[in-house]
Design a protein with these regions (language model features):
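Structural signature of beta-strand start/N-cap positions in the alpha/beta core
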Residues: 17, 43, 84-86, 111-112, ...
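Conserved serine/cysteine hydrolase catalytic core
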Residues: 188-260, 269
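Flexible "cap/lid" loop of the alpha/beta hydrolase fold
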Residues: 109-164
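Catalytic histidine-centered segment of alpha/beta-hydrolase-like enzymes
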Residues: 273-286
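N-terminal cap/lid segment of alpha/beta-hydrolase-fold proteins
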Residues: 1-6
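Conserved HGGG/HGGXW glycine-rich cap/lid loop of the alpha/beta-hydrolase fold
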Residues: 7-59
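Active-site loop signature of alpha/beta-hydrolase-fold enzymes
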Residues: 26-27, 50-55, 121, 249, ...
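Active-site loop/oxyanion-hole signature of alpha/beta-hydrolase fold enzymes
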Residues: 36, 46-88, 92, 101-107, ...
């Protein structure tokens, strides 16, 4: 990578290149069940983001997470000499793709694009009501500020276990509040309370065990003010949107508006899913990825 760190990149299959950009907290191997059926026609190139999987020990750059991810992806594209390739972006991976559309001319290099459950603008304001958590966005930012305050006051701690008991409780309580905010599962509050009262379970609620990386990602979502609406609307290659009909993180209405702003796009709705259709509707998710790829070979 540009800072001489080595990013882990999983490469599976043979054939035309498909670059796959994961969501926050995912590891590259999680994609394998959904891509397995297409492995004879396509080579899937799946980087692990810094802080996760095979890239968990990469140094944290000075820049924000999305800019850093785009730099890493752009470097990978150049190293592998990718051109007219298929791109799949899910959640934070889709944000990284849109960053490339706006700042790196990425759209001109694509044969097709699959955009999975992400908004083109994280903040909510008068011009865009469909950012992260919609009308609950102010509460979301308040919870992230609580997390930031705990982590900033304990920069000497590198792992969750390094925190004092009171700091651990504050961190888990704030993170649990965020999870409850986005959850439609009636069992979730009980699970959060159980974890809060059981130190052994607390760390398993956290998406990242390295606290310096957690702070980096939290500050990214607190400060990210990019607006990618115009950039993604200019994408001309065949584009498919996977949209969770019940997505609380990124309201379906906003995603539909963006899908309709493209000249060559269609939307696939996951009726029983929110932000994680690969978990709630894995069979449909796998089938629709297969259809998307098959359409590009015709």
């Amino acid at each position: 990578m540009p800072d001489q760190e080595k990013l882990f990149v999983r490469r599976v299959g043979e054939g035309k290149p498909v670059l796959v950009l994961s969501g926050l907290g995912m590891q590259s191997w999680l994609w394998l069940p959904f891509l397995f059926a297409s492995r004879k026609k396509y080579e899937f190139i799946i980087p692990d983001w810094r802080g996760f999987g095979g890239s968990k020990d990469c140094a944290i750059p000075e820049m924000d997470a999305i800019s850093s991810h785009w730099n890493d992806v752009n470097t990978l594209i150049k190293q592998l000499k990718l051109d007219q390739f298929i791109l799949i972006g899910y959640s934070m991976g889709a944000t990284t793709a849109m960053h490339g559309f706006k700042h790196g001319g990425l759209a001109q290099k694509l044969k097709a694009y699959l955009h999975i459950d992400q908004t083109p603008k994280i903040p909510v304001d008068d011009s865009w009501q469909y950012g992260l958590l919609g009308q609950k966005h102010p509460l979301f930012k308040s919870l992230l500020l609580d997390i930031q305050n705990v982590l900033s006051a304990n920069r000497q701690a590198t792992q969750f276990e390094d925190l004092a008991t009171s700091a651990r409780d504050q961190l888990v309580k704030a993170w649990g509040g965020f999870l409850e905010l986005q959850s439609s599962n009636s069992y979730s509050p009980k699970l959060f309370k159980a974890a809060l009262n059981c130190p052994f379970l607390q760390k398993y609620l956290m998406p990242i065990q390295r606290l310096d990386y957690l702070l980096w990602y939290v500050e990214n979502y607190l400060n990210h003010d990019e607006d990618y609406r115009e950039a993604i609307s200019q994408v001309n290659c065949p584009t498919t949107f996977f949209i969770g009909r019940s997505s609380t993180l990124y309201p379906e209405t906003g995603q539909t508006i963006i899908a309709q702003s493209l000249s060559n796009a269609k939307a696939v709705y996951f009726e029983r899913s929110g932000h994680t259709p690969l978990i709630t509707q894995p069979r449909k998710f796998s089938q629709e990825i297969g259809k998307f790829l098959e359409n590009q070979s015709q």
